[in-house]
């Protein structure tokens, strides 16, 4: 069965097959809908449904959460990466415009260095086999992991400095039962994998001279690290604070790097807090990373600060509310959810 899909923004009509993935429809039709994670995590492909919402089937809870976290009404918008065609459909404007910077596109990268950080977290350094990579701190790459029956796409934030045009690094936690995370975690020097990108709107504010507060939990430190390295390499001494939350001592990583950066950049203030530390062996702060907002951020400071948050959705939402309550303008809070 064939269904007509109309893209009002591009003035394109395309005949899609029953059950065809809307990402494939957009690609085949040449529609200008932007895509990034292709897994319902980022909200990049959110598009207004003008007519035929019933043709997309029911929404998943994850899709609703992603739309709402991007300030979009789930009754008016759908994530096209999570939708299949089951009837006549008319689509309106995309919620997010296409990026002006052309991505590297699809390419093969080779593992240059594998660096274990904890028992479950590693840093992988990749060499771009052909071409050069240009990315903004905070962006991510999509990895094409070969599965049993098909290729699985997973997004990983770049953790390295953007000045290196031939290499990039990511931070990976091997999750129990996670096929993709374990596959990438097991890669070793010389191994190759296909990637595409870079993508993402989680970027540093252009031209801002306000102080900076960065909040990260777990491997959410990856894009924050890229931002931090970029900022500390610039001229200027505006105050930069990092609140880094982990569970226990065995989860600690990047501590030496953060300590070294503090020694060489006195205006950088990293703070590490553990939520579930062992009874002994941790002399530092204990609690949740959001506790630090209440304890260490004043209302005067919040009014002159840009915030960058990366971690699980509950932490992001709580931190946003706390910062807004402190007087921070919501437009100065940028975030990336990790799943």
Label every model-predicted segment.
Residues 138, 220, 312:
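Short, conserved phosphate/pyrophosphate- and ester-handling motifs at nucleotide-, phospho-/glycolipid
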Residues 225-233:
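Histidine-anchored nucleotide/phosphate-binding helix
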Residues 68-117, 121-126:
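Fe-S ferredoxin-like electron-transfer domains
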Residues 85, 97, 147-150, 197-202:
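Short, charged beta-turn/beta-strand-edge "cap" motif at the junction between a beta-strand
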Residues 21, 28, 44, 88-90, ...:
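Residue-level marker of beta-strand positions
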Residues 103-191, 210, 246-248, 273-277:
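Ferredoxin-reductase
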Residues 1-79, 83, 233, 239-339:
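Reductase modules of NAD(P)H-dependent flavoproteins
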